[in-house]
């Protein structure tokens, strides 16, 4: 069975242009973080149907879909990629196990510095995600795929905000709608959001 190619909303050149990521970082290190960012964070706010629609049509988007992609999704994807990538630039998994990356002319940063850089990237990602969610909720009638998800698809989270370093979202309660996520203390009630 052949693996299908992943459709990426951003490429490594875009990430290196928008962030402080050094141009010498290999694409093979960055691409897995892009894929993870799209699956783990972006899908959470787009929902499965809109994500799949955008992936299918990424090279031919026009109108509101092009605006959504170019103005909102790409920057959010870029910074969520950095949240996932920064720890991988610090630690490397090789034949000998986990090692801290270092070259001859550099010194590795402390864990505190690492966490600070991840949190800076997360703050940027949350900023762009809040803009994305705001745009989608205000213009949901322009995006029929935003509201067409049915179980087992991911339903989009409709609110995103930051509280004490955590991104807190309120969307459909997946437990109520047939998902396998049990209600948590972050839910307004165990049965409805």
Where are these regions (language model features)?
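Conserved short "hinge" loops at termini or chain/domain junctions
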Residues: 1-74, 88-193
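Catalytic-loop motifs flanking and including active-site residues across diverse enzymes
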Residues: 77
